Structure formats: structure tokens, C-alpha cells
Design a protein with these regions (language model features):
Chain A
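Sec/Tat signal peptide C-region and signal peptidase I cleavage site
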Residues: 17-23
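Sec-dependent N-terminal signal peptides of Gram-positive bacterial secreted proteins and lipoproteins
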Residues: 11-17
Length: 379, 294
């Protein structure tokens, strides 16, 4: 009898302990970012932001009383490493969802793994092929390049400019932009008169620009990330190129204005709204999220929050919403993610559906112009 | 007419880029001429020149001239330390081993600069404004004139030094025959050290004057170094003027290739011509073939 009582007591105690442990068990989320390597300008702010947001969610009591645990690995922008680390997250760490990777290459490489393991992935990379065609378990937060192209073409059409020259960088980003520029041109009644490229490390583009100056083009669209576009802006000023110059969202940061100096004046580009959050009209849906993110990032890292951090902010917040609505199982999270509608984030207002795992429209971009070393909205 | 205008612009742009290659090529040739080593860390000296100037300007708040002097001086010291620590201690090393060491050093320098100053590209303000100057229907920037000017000065300086000073002659003697130079009482070790010091200084100077045009970051040295190396090869790794012409030809070909044929194949065109030269005239474009005496 005495033995029975003690066993009952012991098992009761154990039961209590285990439920207590269960309640305290955090929800594990995996994160893969290219914190080092050539894409570190993406990965570093993304990691910072993801950790910042998770810490804050936990400080405010977690999701439905449970803390989030963010397990972050650095892919170094290397697809092979990304695959190994994704396997590690799925098999060893047993995460319920993964955010990142930072680059399109890394994301494409790990898609087969998450599809097989049936773990939802929210990629922070921009390539449209990540979610086209739609994969059951893959979502993304970064705006598609195609949306930026559409934003530029829309403006050109409004100004009745139909002949353009394009100058794109010969890397993945430029190739994707070039593809989109060519694919969408006909739809907006635009004719591409000259199609040139430059190398990512080139230091002089006057040859290409002299050729464009001699053509009938009414606008130049240049697709690249720093420092190439800054060189192009300076060369264009040197040559006295008189047609309007449009850049891509790849240079939508103050760094571009700093590098191009006076030559940046008058250049237009499609940008996510982070850049011009304080200029947005009061009724903009994203305004509250944007201002909160910028203030938060400023407090934590003494630097201006950018789009890249924004992609991670969106990924964590979308995940938080999905866990609240769909529970902590991978399948539940996936279904809740797909059902997300009108979520005002940093990159845009997200509405996922069974047919659209990118979730944004071209209104995610706003067209800005450089004036007096600062951005103004193009009306 | 339009085409003529364009071609003028291509040539002027090409010459401007080419003189950058020429200057970097020269600093390759200086070390090669006295040691027989191809210093693949040369591009890193160029990068250090630019990065250190920007650092002295923005963080130490020095005036431009002082910042440039500091940058060149510090890079020169780095060149000296590099020779002392990595080249000197290896007795009887083959040139191939030394070349591999310079590659290692270049990776090390690049990594350290990345850790110390970050990965961002930075721009140096132009020395005398950015108002374009018009020449025969084409335009160039005041900074291009600085580059032309400094290149000419460096060539003249090298000429005078190597042909008319005792140290310069001694350095040339080392490149012809180390052993004989040693026998006549030239301290070969000191001459090698000298060559690293001079070439680090020239490299840094090149880095400083091109930084306002090309901007600078921890990794600009790789491509610039490669192009400078091409210029030096075209010039036969020797005679000052040959390397300069090599650089100018390379720059002009790139620019004409990009403008007239296809910008996508710009580098391919330049490197194809480099290969042709290596096949047809391995001794360089402007050098007479050397005959080995037996």
C-alpha cells in the first residue's frame, strides 16, 4: 500500500513536471542567412532584424504564451552550405518553419529539402522563380523584380515615352532584371532600342553610355547593385546624357546617393516604402509597420533599417501570425500562411493564396527621385 | 558624324582607363624587374592606397594632401613588412613558391581590410571638381588628367631611377643575374626590399588617384590587379614605356569592344587579345627577343 502511494505520488510529481516543461518548451524556428560572403549586405541586416523581432515577441510574452527560439545559421551565400544547414535545421533541430535564405541561389537549392520534409519556408530572396510555379511549402517576402519593372514601365507609359535603352549588370540580379525588362516591354508598348551589359567590377561605362547617347532612346533603365550604378550615374553626367535615367530597386539606399554624389540628382528608381516612410500619406496601410520597424532598428543597431532587414521582419511577423492562427505544427503553419490576407508589412501588403506565394502587387514599390541628396516621391 | 563622335569618346575613355592599368602594370614590372617575382598582392596595394586615404580623410579628418601622404606611407610600410616577413625568410625559394606566397598575402590583406573597414564601397571626392572637359567632341573628367599626369611623372621617375642612379642600376643588375650582382658587391636582399617599397608606393599612389573615379572597397584590388598584370605582360614585363603602351592598348580595346561589338564580351575581347599576344609574342609587344648565350 505504502509502495502504491509513493508510486502514485512520484508519477503525479513527474506528470506535473513534464507539463510544466511542456509549457515552457519554446517553438523552434530555423533561420538561414548569408551573414558573411558576397551577399552579406543582405544577410547581416536580415539576421539582426530577425533576432530583434523574435526577442521582442518573447519579451511581450511570446506567441500564445510560448516563447520562440530562433536557430540561425550562416550560409555564406554558398548553396552547398545552405543545403547542409537546411538539412541540419530539419533533422537535428526539428524546427517547425524556416525563414531565409538571403539569396535566390540558396533558396532554390533548399526548396527540395523543405518540400520533402514538409516544413514551411519563407524565403527573403527576390527571384520570382522561388514561388513560380507555386510550391506547396515555399513562400517569400522580398518583392519580385518584375514588380519593379512594371512600376518603371507604368511611369514611362504615363509620360508617353516608348523607346528605352537598357544597361544591366552581368550577374544574377542583372540577368533577372534584363529578362523581366524584355518580357514586359511589349505589354506596356515599349520598344527596347539598345540592350547593353556591364561587369559587376567595371569601373568605366562611358563606352556603353556613348552608344546609348547616339541612339533614339527616350529613357535609360539601368539594373544593378552598388557600385556599378553609381559609376553609370557619374559617367552619364560626364557625357552630358540628357534623357531621364531610371535605376533598379537594387540601389535604393542612401549609399547610392553618397557614392554617385551630384550625379545622382534627378535619377529615379522604384523602391520599397521603407526609404520614404515619413513621406507616405497618413492613410497608407504600411505606415504604422514601417515607422515601428525603423524606430526599433535605430534603437538596436544605431543604423537605418533597410529593405533587407524588412524582408526578415515580414517573415517573422507572418510566421507569428500563422502560429497564432494555425498552431505550432508545420502543416498548420503552412495552411495559416496561405490564408494570410492584407497583412501590412515592410515590403508591402501581403495577401497569399493557393495560387500566389509571393503575395505582393506592384504597389509594394513606390517611384522615388533623388533631389538635393534626398528622396522625393514621384507624382 | 555621330559614329565618329562615338569612336572618339570610346578612344578617350579607353585611354583614361588604360592609363590606370598602365600605372598598376608599372608597379608589377618594378618588382619583377629586380626580383623575378610576380607580386599578386599588387592589386591589394592599390586598394590600400584608396581605402587608407578615405579612412584618413573621414575618420582622422586630415586634409586631402596629408591623407594621401599618410595612405602612401602606410602602404609602403606594409610593403616593407610584407617583404621582411614573407619573402626574405625563404632562402632558395623558387619563383613559383614566392608567387604563391604573394597570392596568400593578397587574400590576407583583403580579409583584414574587410574586417577593419567593412564591405561597403566608398567614394573619395574628386581632386579638382567633376565638371566634364570637352575634347574633340568627347568628354573626360579633370580626374582623368590627374591620372594621365601622375602616370607620366611615374614613368619619368622610373626611367631616371633605373637608368641614372646607382641603386636603380643595382636593382636592374639583380634582375639580370642575382649571383653576379652579389659577386660584385650588391646586396641583393636590400635591392629586393627596395623594389617592394617602391612598388607598394607606386601601387598606393595609383589607388589614391583612381579612387575618386572608380570608388574603392576591400575587393577592388583583384580586378585592377589582373588588368594591370595584363598591361605588364603586353609590355613584356619590362621597359617602362612598353607596359604603359600595353595598358593604353588594353583600355582602348576594351572600350572599343564594348562600344562597337558587344558590351557583354568586353572582357572576353581584351583577354582574347592578351592570349594572342602570349602565343605570338611571349616576350611582349615591344621587346626584342632575347637570345640566350651559351
Amino acid at each position: 500500500m505504502k509502495k502504491l502511494v509513493s508510486t502514485a505520488f512520484a508519477s503525479f510529481a513527474l506528470f506535473c513536471l513534464s507539463t510544466a516543461a511542456l509549457a515552457a518548451q519554446p517553438i523552434k524556428i530555423g533561420a538561414l542567412f548569408a551573414v558573411t560572403g558576397p551577399a552579406s549586405f543582405l544577410g547581416e541586416p536580415e539576421r539582426n532584424t530577425a533576432q530583434m523581432v523574435v526577442d521582442e515577441i518573447n519579451k511581450a510574452g511570446g506567441v500564445k504564451g510560448r516563447k520562440l527560439e530562433l536557430i540561425t545559421y550562416d550560409t555564406g551565400g554558398d548553396a552547398t552550405k545552405a543545403v547542409q544547414l537546411a538539412n541540419k535545421l530539419v533533422k537535428n533541430d526539428q524546427v517547425v518553419a524556416i525563414i531565409g535564405p538571403s539569396t535566390t541561389g540558396d533558396s532554390m537549392a533548399i526548396i527540395p529539402i523543405v518540400e520533402k520534409a514538409q516544413v514551411p519556408l519563407i524565403s527573403c530572396a527576390a527571384g520570382s522563380k522561388i514561388t513560380e510555379p507555386v510550391k506547396k511549402w515555399v513562400f517569400k517576402t522580398a518583392q519580385n523584380d518584375g514588380l519593379a519593372v512594371a512600376k518603371i514601365y507604368e511611369q514611362l507609359k504615363k509620360e508617353k515615352k516608348t523607346k528605352v535603352a537598357i544597361l544591366t549588370v552581368s550577374d544574377g540580379f542583372g540577368a533577372s532584371g534584363r529578362e523581366q525588362l524584355k518580357a514586359q516591354a511589349a505589354h506596356y508598348g515599349i520598344q527596347i532600342l539598345s540592350d547593353d551589359t556591364y561587369g559587376p567590377k567595371d569601373t568605366d561605362m562611358t563606352a556603353q553610355l556613348a552608344k546609348i547617347r547616339g541612339s533614339q532612346a527616350q529613357a535609360l533603365i539601368c539594373w544593378g547593385t552598388n557600385p556599378g550604378p553609381a559609376v553609370i550615374a557619374r559617367n552619364a553626367k560626364q557625357l552630358g546624357l540628357s534623357i531621364p535615367v531610371y535605376m533598379s530597386h537594387g540601389v535604393s539606399s542612401k549609399k547610392f546617393i553618397e557614392l554617385a554624389g551630384d550625379a545622382a540628382e534627378g535619377i529615379r528608381l522604384p523602391s520599397g516604402k521603407v526609404l520614404v516612410a515619413d513621406l507616405l500619406p497618413k492613410n497608407d496601410k504600411q505606415r504604422a509597420s514601417l515607422l515601428a520597424f525603423i524606430k526599433d532598428y535605430q534603437n538596436h543597431f544605431k543604423a537605418e533599417g533597410d529593405h533587407f532587414g524588412g524582408h526578415a521582419w515580414d517573415a517573422v511577423m507572418l510566421l507569428k501570425g500563422a502560429i497564432e492562427r494555425g498552431g505550432d505544427t508545420p502543416a498548420g503553419i503552412r495552411n495559416a500562411l496561405e490564408a494570410t490576407r492584407n497583412f501590412p508589412g515592410i515590403g508591402g501588403v501581403f495577401s497569399y493564396s493557393a495560387k500566389d506565394h509571393a503575395g505582393l502587387t506592384k504597389d509594394a514599390f513606390t517611384l522615388v527621385e533623388v533631389r538635393k541628396k534626398d528622396w522625393v516621391l514621384v507624382k | 558624324m555621330e559614329l565618329l563622335n562615338q569612336v572618339t569618346q570610346f578612344v578617350i575613355s579607353g585611354l583614361a582607363t588604360g592609363s590606370i592599368y598602365a600605372l598598376i602594370g608599372l608597379s608589377f614590372a618594378i618588382i619583377f624587374n629586380s626580383t623575378g617575382i610576380i607580386n599578386f598582392a599588387q592589386g591589394e596595394f592599390v586598394m590600400l592606397g584608396g581605402v587608407l586615404t578615405i579612412f584618413s580623410l573621414n575618420v582622422l579628418h586630415l586634409p586631402l594632401i596629408a591623407a594621401i601622404l599618410v595612405a602612401v606611407a602606410v602602404t609602403t610600410v606594409i610593403g616593407l613588412v610584407f617583404e621582411r616577413l614573407a619573402i626574405r625568410p625563404l632562402k632558395n625559394a623558387t619563383p613559383l613558391m614566392l608567387i604563391i606566397i604573394t597570392i596568400g598575402a593578397s587574400i590576407l590583406i583583403r580579409g583584414l581590410v574587410m574586417l577593419l573597414w567593412g564591405k561597403d564601397t566608398q567614394a573619395l571626392p574628386a581632386f579638382s571638381g567633376t565638371d566634364p572637359i570637352s575634347v574633340a567632341g568627347a568628354t573626360l573628367l579633370p580626374q582623368h588628367l590627374w591620372i594621365f599626369g601622375v602616370t607620366v611623372l611615374v614613368i619619368i621617375g622610373c626611367r631616371l631611377f633605373f637608368n641614372h642612379t646607382i641603386s636603380g642600376k643595382a636593382m636592374r643588375a639583380c634582375s639580370f643575374n642575382r649571383r653576379a650582382a652579389n659577386l660584385v658587391g650588391i646586396s641583393v636582399g636590400r635591392m629586393v626590399l627596395f623594389s617592394f617599397v617602391i612598388s607598394a608606393a607606386v601601387g598606393a599612389l595609383a589607388g589614391v588617384i583612381i579612387a575618386p573615379l572608380t570608388m574603392t572597397a576591400y575587393d577592388v584590388g583583384v580586378m585592377l590587379g589582373l588588368k594591370g598584370f595584363c598591361a605588364a605582360i603586353m609590355g613584356g614585363m619590362g621597359s617602362g614605356l612598353g607596359t604603359v603602351l600595353g595598358g593604353l592598348i588594353l583600355g582602348t580595346l576594351e572600350s572599343l569592344g564594348a562600344g562597337l561589338i558587344s558590351s557583354g564580351y568586353k572582357d572576353a575581347i581584351a583577354f582574347f587579345i592578351l592570349l594572342l599576344i602570349l602565343f605570338i609574342r611571349p616576350q611582349g609587344l615591344f621587346k626584342k627577343g632575347e637570345t640566350e648565350r651559351v
